[in-house]
């Protein structure tokens, strides 16, 4: 049973940041249209951004341009998923 949410593309962006810039990174990231949530983490990473869009190009722009332009990012790992609609078209 597929719903509208399963057709959306998502990305989880895990960040190591300079603590002095963390608050600014969170505030700016929340203004990006594809960013649905920003979470502070304990452990290997400092922040996780959850991105979502019907358009993979929008997610790509957010990661490749918007997030990369933020001051204070030390390291970034992106985990990008594809919606079920995209998976079905690949498998056909």
Q: Where would I find each of the regions flagged by the language model?
A:
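A compositional/biophysical signature of low hydrophobicity enriched in polar/charged and small residues
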Residues: 1-92
